[in-house]
Amino acid sequence: MRADHLKFAVLVSANAEWKALKPSFPEARIEDSPYGQFFFERVDEQTVLFCHGGWGKVAAAASTQYVIDRFNPERLINIGTCGGIEGRIRRFDVVVPDRVVIYDIHEAMGDDPREGVAYY
């Protein structure tokens, strides 16, 4: 499935988040990109690109730019949360931040957010 005019691209960073998302679309044809996996799916009569780009600011920036350059979506939606807010956000909460804190993440960190928090 390809989109002549792609309205939405959904970006997913963490492996655990990508693993949780894929079963929602069991018929999806998973493809590989230089940054991770992606697939197209129809959602409410719209073709939507779902892309796993990896975590960390470099991987996120690179995979986001790849999606923009290759697919030219009108809107980018980034799903997931950072591990530093554990216990403050519940499942299905929608978070609209009023500020962002950027810090370097420890590259050996896995998907368990406690590993990164313990490192710092």
Walk through the language-model features, giving the residues of each.
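Short, low-complexity, polar/charged sequence segments that are solvent-exposed and flexible
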Residues: 28-32, 68-72, 95-98, 113-117
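Structural motif
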Residues: 75-77
